[in-house]
Each structure stands twice: as structure tokens, then as C-alpha cells.
């Protein structure tokens, strides 16, 4: 793995040189086995993520090559989504990708159920959660295709102004 300068500027556009150095230092501290990639265990050692029920989904979204680990490039790309300098569209796409598990551009009933199940655990019975999912799909699905597109998701999130609260965790 090279130094910070070995990464194209476009992947680091939300971070200045000092921030990249700080992120590199943090990455190396998390990389306990010095493998140049963070395993699930190493990734979840971040205090910000230890209690997050969606940590596996965050890892899956960060892990763009699908190898089950997060290398420094993926770490920079992923954390840049939380930068206060990141744009609204990127933040919305990141949030959408947490739900779009199969990466087909839509949130299906099953995907919404799985992600909400991660969040609520056993606090709701499955039938109660399914009712919530069904109602959510009906409410958000403006074109009636039975799934939530990025546009439908974005419209709701923008109306709630949730995206303004997606700020840096690094």
C-alpha cells in the first residue's frame, strides 16, 4: 500500500492532505494485523460503530470490491460520504445503499424488512415489522411498482431534512 499521494485526488476530494494523513493514521491503528485492509472485527472496533446495529451494512457499502474487507481506498471513499463538505446527493446515495442490499437501484419489501430487523432486533414481532414495512412501501412507492427507487427515497428524506444530519464520524 503506497502513501496518501498514491490515491487519485478525485477519490479524496472531501479531504485535505492533513485529513488524509489523519485518516491514514487511524486506519493503521485499526488494522491490527497490518494486512492493509480492515476485517469486520477491526472495522467494528471503531467506537462510533460498536453499538450500531447497521455496522455490517456500512461495511458492505464501504467494501466496493466485495472481498469482505475494507482497504484504505475504500475507507477514504466510505468516510468521505460523511464529510461535512460532501454534497447532499452523495449522502443520500450512501443512505439509500444501506437499504439497497442487492444493489439493483431499488429498496424491495424484503430489503427494507431485513434492514429494519437489524435496527429493531426482537423489539417487534416479525408480523408487526412486516406491517410497518408494507405501510412504508405503500407510502413511499409513488409509481406503484412495489419498491422504492432512489428518487422516491430522496424525496422523502429531503422533505424530512434528515440528510443535513449525516455528518462526519471520523
Swiss-Prot record:
This is Calcineurin subunit B type 2. PROSITE patterns: EF_HAND_1, EF_HAND_2. The gene is PPP3R2. Ca(2+) 3 binds at residues 141, 143, 145, 147, 152. Belongs to the calcineurin regulatory subunit family. Residues 18-46, 50-85, 87-122, 128-163 form the EF-hand domain. GO terms for molecular function: calcium ion binding; calcium-dependent protein serine/threonine phosphatase regulator activity; phosphatase binding. It comes from Bos taurus (Bovine). Forms a complex composed of a calmodulin-dependent catalytic subunit (also known as calcineurin A) and a regulatory Ca(2+)-binding subunit (also known as calcineurin B). There are three catalytic subunits, each encoded by a separate gene (PPP3CA, PPP3CB, and PPP3CC) and two regulatory subunits which are also encoded by separate genes (PPP3R1 and PPP3R2). Interacts with SPATA33 (via PQIIIT motif).
Amino acid at each position: 500500500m503506497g502513501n496518501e499521494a498514491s490515491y487519485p485526488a478525485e477519490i479524496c476530494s472531501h479531504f485535505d492532505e492533513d485529513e488524509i494523513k489523519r485518516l491514514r493514521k487511524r486506519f493503521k491503528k485499526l488494522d491490527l494485523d497490518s494486512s492493509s485492509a480492515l476485517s469486520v472485527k477491526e472495522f467494528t472496533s471503531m467506537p462510533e460503530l460498536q453499538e450500531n446495529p447497521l455496522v455490517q451494512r456500512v461495511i458492505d457499502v464501504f467494501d466496493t470490491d466485495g472481498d469482505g474487507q475494507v482497504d484504505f481506498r475504500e475507507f477514504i471513499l466510505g468516510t468521505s460520504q460523511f464529510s461535512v463538505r460532501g454534497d447532499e446527493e452523495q449522502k443520500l446515495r450512501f443512505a439509500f445503499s444501506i437499504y439497497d442490499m442487492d444493489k439493483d437501484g431499488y429498496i424491495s419489501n424484503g430489503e427494507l424488512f431485513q434492514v429494519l430487523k437489524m435496527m429493531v432486533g426482537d423489539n417487534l414481532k416479525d408480523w408487526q415489522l412486516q406491517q410497518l414495512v408494507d405501510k412504508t412501501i405503500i407510502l413511499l412507492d409513488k409509481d406503484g411498482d412495489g419498491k422504492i427507487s432512489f428518487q422516491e427515497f430522496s424525496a422523502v428524506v429531503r422533505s424530512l431534512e434528515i440528510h443535513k444530519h449525516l455528518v462526519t464520524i471520523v
